[in-house]
From Swiss-Prot, chain A:
HAMAP family: SecY (MF_01465). Component of the plastid Sec protein translocase complex, which is composed of at least SecY, SecE and SecG. It is a multi-pass membrane protein. The gene is secY. PANTHER family: SECY/SEC61-ALPHA FAMILY MEMBER. Keywords: Chloroplast, Membrane, Plastid, Protein transport, Thylakoid, Translocation, Transmembrane, Transmembrane helix, Transport. This is Protein translocase subunit SecY.
UniProtKB/Swiss-Prot annotation, chain B:
The keyword Aminoacyl-tRNA synthetase does not apply. It holds the Pfam family SecA_DEAD. One of its GO terms (molecular function) is ATP binding. It comes from Trieres chinensis (Marine centric diatom). The lineage of its organism: Eukaryota, Sar, Stramenopiles, Ochrophyta, Bacillariophyta. It catalyses: ATP + H2O + cellular proteinSide 1 = ADP + phosphate + cellular proteinSide 2. Keywords: ATP-binding, Chloroplast, Membrane, Nucleotide-binding, Plastid, Protein transport, Thylakoid, Translocase, Translocation, Transport. GO terms for cellular component: chloroplast stroma; chloroplast thylakoid membrane. Disulfide bonds: none annotated. SMART domains: SecA_DEAD (SM00957), SecA_PP_bind (SM00958). The keyword Plastid applies. Has a central role in coupling the hydrolysis of ATP to the transfer of proteins across the thylakoid membrane. The gene is secA. This is Protein translocase subunit SecA.
Length: 425, 888
């Protein structure tokens, strides 16, 4: 009894998580040596575009290039890439499915390597971007900056893994969470300053209401699921069938198919895809079309086209991604392997078909909700002309809600394993 | 996590000061008389009572134990053994090589911890070891004034209780675990065996806590089973083809029924759906296929007395009381056409993992723990310490030889045996299954090599000690399964003690019968029968005189053969016998031993010069520890020895867990008879083995994580149960239950909005009494919830009191027992039900991962709900039954 007691104490875990988050937060403001921040500030005051760049890194309006400037983002990108690779490369997906602890370890170390690569790229780009801002810029300094930032990113990765292992919550998601939350004050300020006086109270209330609805919708989206009930060989083998009297509902044998299997991935992918046209346009490849684009009709409809394609793409990516997360064929095979079946449906092809159909419906519902939630703020913004509202995008909201839900679940799980200690009266 | 590599001191350094202090005390202790030594025990006990700190007593108690051991057994603990004792006392695992005297080491912490008067348990893996250790080591404790106990399978309740009350109890893990479970099913406090746990030393700790971790201890009662389905399902398998109708997965020991297979079976059986809950076939079919294609006779089980007996994979021994679960055992019985025994229903169960964690202080010893260090640390919080050997280890582990296929491997083994046997070096060949050991025996027969075979077959088990005793003899070849692992001590040149005992037994028994038949002058006549005696006549006349006295001793003549054997076997363990004929027999043994010693010594030297015991492994086991156990049979106490593993590309380990590409390369490159001997391949094999170990570790870790919840629930239930069991009267409990039940009922009915006369009838149904008879239903609706509850409570108290009075009048004095038993019975019943639900839940939550839910968290969530539900149902049943009960 004793050895689990202190390991699973909620308070200890909470304190550890908070401590590490605080440490990383502090590290973000710890200036990288060699960079003259006076020069930087001077430059930034003149070049607003860079200001947005630097501040987005740290999550608020600092002009410090800190040790942990890259934060957890290299890792996030790396794991997204890894996730895609796993689902696309048959060798890797086989490794993940069949291998045990060792496979998990090798995938983890691959992700870490990718993180290292990504941080190198990202820190190099920062180093070269700073060339314009710093007088004493030279290759040695650039090299140093790369080393500092990459090291910082790797330390953050290590700390985040410690949170996952010994603390409360999942390290990387908690870090993203803190980054989003730390940008909230700035966001509110921005909204207030940019729309002060122009907006009536009514729109404020309305937008508050919309925010509430959006949050509610997100929770529903995250938690909503369709239970596919199962009947297992083991259950049938139980001699006195404790559940035989009641229906299957009580048995606990079910597959929960979530409305939103894919999480925030569809939005991220969509955003990434939608950047491409702008990018191409900026490259000047479409110069021939310029007269066409600048036509007033087109400018007006451009936004609409953008949002429609945004909506459609999210829908498509959701559908595509959910089949990656849960493949009906694999699921059906797994059911057959474990001698478990869906009542009334024959194992094998019939089950696959059934699952495919159920999943299609469930995901479609979830995808529509997701797409609606993602485009909603923009529509609101357009209607109420509350600028800055989009900054708190649905992605952020989804992450915030997701992290909080995960946290509560983890806390509940810890409480539920310790609850029995209180039963010795 | 953060460990300074420079800070890590060697184990010897760590305990240096303590060892020095113990050694310093030795001369003082030596001067004490026996009586004074014994007196010291009482002093130490008193000091513990005063100080409540064992650490202050370590030095003195260790010195005392060492001296007592020297005076009783003639064995003085080496310094490394003292280190072992300190490690054990520190609640850690001591890794000690074979033959380093683990049993003696255990006496040090056992004595020390017994000073608390709270009892010490020394757990061994089998009864023979328990009784051997208790008889020999018991002398030390007795000398020091402590009681020892021994638990054996056939003991009665009072015997068990008495033995568990002893200061130090030797017991097998099996018995101990089951006694714990039985204690928690007892309906009367008088039937409880065990005291609260204090300290435990587990011998062969890796076997108990790791190899057996996945097999839970189960107390079950049989339920009526329909055997037809097992038989029909078994017959169906004849009409199924591998890879057409079903597929097998050797790694996970599971089978998959294909669509074609499903259709085929449905056609044969003439049913629509195998999963039909009203007429389920699928579990029977799956089990039948598993039985026919994954479980083999003489590999996984043997057939003995018309029964299926499981052969344990790790120890190679049969497990007569163990049965496969979930209908698999019945399926195997159907396959082998033996009587199908009834299925069982778990009434109580616990895993060794959780059972041993009940001890506030736990320690263990084994020869092979280092490779499982992480597991011991993570699951049991038991650090592993390697104890240095008293003498340097001379064993030589030769690199593995890898052959192209099984055929050339076995041939190579036989040839190797032939070559080695030319110089008469003793050989021990370890095989993994009964089947393979017999196959190899046949092969050796063809090569005309005489050999002994040791496996789980009953005829071989009977000769086990004899085979082992001779395994170290010049020129002997022994084929064994994993049985020749733990606790097998092979002495080079043969074990004379064993030979002497055997010879003497034959002599004594013959004479016993002859004197009984009044053939006076038998001794001189029958010298002819035993050539040994004739030889002895020349060297020791005294032997014959004593023998003559002995066979005229009335007491001796009254002994049965078995008793003679027992005395002979124990004579080595007991140094100072008490009864006269025991003395005589001891003398005879010593005399014979002395006589044989010269030849034995010579043999020993010869075998040592030949290079000691040569161990041949025929296949890598799933775990490195098991291989090391086999290797550890040679090179004991600084003897020379060699070990080599002969492997083939077709071995299970390589086939299932190796690299497919490597396999192909090896297969194409290897010539028929030429082996590959390369460090690289050995390394690859090591990593494959590591992978298997890791997989199994994951399984056990997973089991542990899930079982942890059930264990916490079990602790709560057992605690509550124990309190009821120990209480004078369960009256308070009943009243508390009553209050809870009433508040649960009322709040539930309120929630469901049940009013009026319906409410009255519902409550009457739920409580089983005539409550509320004189209560107008209209008034009910106007009552506040709290008033309504108070009213019901009053009614409950009244009915309860009247019930007690009623019972007291009819059967005076029965009420307390009645109440207690009532609660206990329903607790047990609902716990049993709960266990079944939890076992299903464990299975069910696995599917939740498809909703990106953590199965463990989901398990915790649902387990808590089930647990709460269990409590509610128990309370309701108790109150319902109590209020309804009428005098019969």
């Amino acid at each position: 009894m004793k050895q689990t007691d202190d390991k699973d104490s909620l308070l200890n875990r909470l304190l550890l998580s908070l401590g590490i988050l605080l440490f990383i937060r502090m590290g973000t403001f710890l200036p990288v040596p060699g960079i003259d921040h006076g020069h930087l500030e001077f430059y930034i005051e003149r070049h607003f575009r860079l200001r947005t760049l630097v501040s987005t890194f740290a999550g608020d309006n600092t002009v410090v290039v800190g040790l942990f400037t890259l934060n957890i983002f290299p890792y996030i990108n790396a794991s997204i890439i890894m996730q895609l690779l796993v689902s696309l490369l048959p060798g890797l997906s086989k490794l993940q499915k069949e291998g045990g602890a060792e496979a998990r370890r090798s995938i983890n170390s691959l992700t870490r390597l990718l993180t290292l690569g990504w941080s190198l790229i990202q820190s190099t780009s920062v180093a070269f971007y700073l060339k314009r801002a710093l007088f004493e810029w030279n290759l040695v300094l650039a090299f140093e900056i790369v080393i500092w930032l990459t090291t910082g990113a790797m330390i953050v990765l290590w700390l985040s893994e410690i949170i996952t292992e010994y603390g409360l919550g999942n390290g990387p998601s908690l870090l993203i969470y803190t980054n989003i939350v730390s940008s909230l004050p700035g966001f509110v300020k921005q909204v207030i300053t940019e729309s002060s006086g122009k907006v009536p109270i009514g729109s404020w209330l309305l937008s508050g209401f919309v925010l509430f609805v959006a949050l509610y919708g997100i929770v529903l989206l995250q938690e909503g699921m369709r239970k596919v009930y199962l009947i297992s060989s083991k259950q049938l083998n139980q001699t006195s069938l404790p559940f035989s009297g009641s229906s299957n509902l009580e048995s606990g044998y079910y597959i929960p198919l979530r409305f939103n299997q894919a999480g925030v991935m569809p939005i991220i992918l969509t955003t990434a895809v939608l950047v491409i046209p702008t990018f191409i346009y900026n490259l000047g490849l479409l110069r021939i079309l310029t007269p066409l684009i600048t036509l007033p009709v087109f400018v007006k409809s451009y936004k609409i086209i953008y949002w429609v394609s945004y909506f459609v793409l999210i829908l498509l990516f959701s559908l595509f991604y959910s089949t990656i997360v849960v493949n009906p064929k694999d699921l059906s095979d797994e059911l057959q392997k474990m001698a478990v079946s869906i009542p009334g449906i024959r194992p094998g092809v019939e089950t696959t078909f059934y699952l495919k159909q159920v999943m299609k419906r469930v995901t479609l519902l979830g995808a529509i909700m997701l797409a609606l939630l993602a485009t909603l703020p923009n529509i609101i913004q357009a209607i109420l002309s509350l600028s800055g509202f989009t900054n708190l995008g649905t992605t952020s909201l989804l992450i915030l809600v997701g992290v909080i839900l995960d946290l509560t679940r983890e806390m509940r799980s810890i409480i539920l394993s310790n609850i029995y200690y209180d039963m010795f009266d | 996590m953060l460990k300074n590599p420079f800070k890590k001191k060697s184990i010897a350094d760590k305990y240096q000061t303590l060892i020095r202090e113990i050694n310093a005390l030795e001369s003082t202790v030596k001067t004490l008389t026996d009586g004074e030594l014994r007196n010291k025990t009482n002093q130490l006990k008193q000091r513990y009572q005063d100080e409540q700190n064992l650490n202050n007593l370590i030095v003195e108690s260790f010195a005392l134990t060492r001296e007592a051991s020297y005076r009783t057994l003639g064995l003085r603990h080496f310094d490394v053994q003292l280190i072992g004792g300190l490690v054990l006392n520190g609640g850690k695992i001591a890794e000690m090589r074979t033959g380093e005297g683990k049993t003696l080491v255990a006496t040090l912490p056992a004595y020390l911890n017994a000073l608390t008067k709270k009892g010490v348990h020394i757990v061994t893996v089998n009864e023979y070891l328990a009784s051997r250790d208790q008889t020999s080591m018991g002398q030390i404790y007795r000398f020091l004034g402590l009681e020892t106990g021994l638990i054996q399978e056939k003991m009665t309740t009072p015997e068990r209780q008495r033995n568990y009350k002893a200061d130090i109890t030797y017991v097998t893990n099996n018995e101990l675990g089951f006694d714990y479970l039985r204690d928690n099913l007892a309906l009367n406090i008088r039937d409880v065996f065990l005291r609260p746990f204090n300290y435990c030393i587990v011998d062969e700790v890796d076997s108990v806590l790791i190899d057996e971790a996945l097999t839970p201890l189960i107390i079950a009662n049989s339920v009526k089973t329909c055997v037809d389905k097992y038989i029909i399902a078994s017959e169906i398998t004849d009409y199924l083809e591998l890879n057409v109708h079903f597929e097998i997965d050797e790694k996970n020991k599971s089978v998959l029924l294909t669509n074609q297979g499903t259709i085929q079976i449905e056609k044969i059986l003439g049913v629509q759906d195998l999963y039909n809950p009203r007429d389920p076939w699928i579990p029977y079919v799956i089990n039948a296929i598993r039985a026919s294609s994954l479980f083999f006779r003489d590999v996984h089980y043997i057939v003995q007395n018309n029964r299926i007996v499981i052969v344990d994979e790790f120890t190679g021994r049969i497990m007569p009381d163990r049965r496969w679960r979930h209908g698999l055992h019945q399926a195997v019985e159907a396959k082998e056409n033996v009587a199908i025994r009834q299925t069982t229903e778990i009434t109580a169960s616990i895993t060794y993992q959780n059972f041993f964690l009940v001890y506030p202080k736990l320690s263990g010893m084994t020869g092979t723990a280092k490779t499982a260090e992480v597991e011991f640390d993570k699951i049991y919080s038991l650090p592993v310490e390697e104890i240095p050997t008293a003498r340097p280890n001379l064993r030589q582990d030769l690199p593995d030889l890898i052959y192209k296929d099984e055929f050339s491997k076995w041939n190579a083994i036989a040839k190797e045996c032939q070559n080695i046997s030319l110089v008469k070096q003793p050989i021990l060949i370890g095989t993994t299954t009964v089947e393979k050991s017999e196959m190899l025996a046949q092969l050796l027969q063809e090569y005309r090599l005489s050999h002994q075979i040791l496996n789980a077959k009953p005829e071989n088990v009977r000769r086990e000690s004899e085979i082992v005793a001779q395994a170290g003899k010049k020129g002997s070849i022994t084929i064994a399964t994993n049985m020749a692992g733990r606790g097998t001590d092979i002495i080079l040149g043969g074990n004379i003690q064993f030979k002497v005992r055997k010879d003497l037994y034959n002599i004594l028994v013959t004479y016993k019968y002859q004197t009984k038949e009044n053939k006076k002058d038998s001794l001189s006549r029958s010298l002819q029968i035993f050539p040994l005696l004739k030889k002895l006549q020349r060297t020791s006349q005294k032997f014959l005189t004593v023998l003559n006295c002995l066979i005229n001793n009335k007491q001796f003549l009254n002994l049965s053969d078995v008793e003679v054997l027992k005395i002979l076997n124990e004579s080595e363990l007991i140094r100072v016998p008490k009864i006269s004929y025991q003395c005589s027999m001891k003398f005879l043994i010593n005399e014979l031993v002395n006589f044989e010693k010269k030849t034995q010594k010579l043999d020993n030297v010869i075998v040592k010069n030949l290079g000691g015991l040569y161990i041949i492994g025929t296949e890598r086991n799933d775990s490195q520890r098991i291989d090391n156990q086999l290797r550890g049979r040679c090179g004991r106490q600084g003897d020379p020895g060699k070990s080599r593993f002969f492997l083939s590309v077709e071995d299970k380990l390589i086939r299932l867990f190796g690299d497919a590409r490597l396999e192909n390369v090896l297969k194409s490159q290897l010539l028929d008879d030429l082996p590959l001997e390369s460090e690289l391949v050995t390394k690859i094999l090591d990593s494959a083995q590591k992978r298997v170990e890791e997989r199994n570790y994951e399984l056990r870790k997973n089991l542990f994580d899930y079982d942890d919840i059930l264990n916490k629930q079990r602790n709560v239930v057992y605690y509550e149960r124990r309190k009821v069991l120990e209480s004078e009267s369960a009256r308070i409990k009943i009243l508390a239950y009553g209050e809870q039940v009433i508040s649960e009922i009322t709040s539930k009915l309120r929630r469901k909005k049940v009013f009026g006369s319906q409410l009255i009838s519902r409550i009457r149904n739920l409580l089983g009494t005539k409550f509320l008879l004189n209560f107008p239903s209209s008034d009910l609706n106007n009552l506040e919830s709290i008033d309504f509850q108070t009213y019901l409570l009053q009614e409950f108290w009244l009915s309860y009191e009247s019930k007690i009075l009623e019972l007291e009048v009819e059967y005076p004095g029965i009420i307390q027992e009645f109440e207690r038993t009532l609660i206990l019975i329903y607790m047990d019943r609902e716990w049993k039900e709960h266990l079944q639900k939890m076992s299903l839940l464990r299975d069910a939550v696995g599917w939740r991962k498809y909703g990106q839910r953590n199965p463990l968290s989901e398990y915790k969530e649902d387990a808590y709900k089930l647990f709460k539900y269990r409590g509610i149902v128990t309370r309701h049943l108790v109150i319902y039954e109590l209020l309804r009960s009428s005098i019969l």
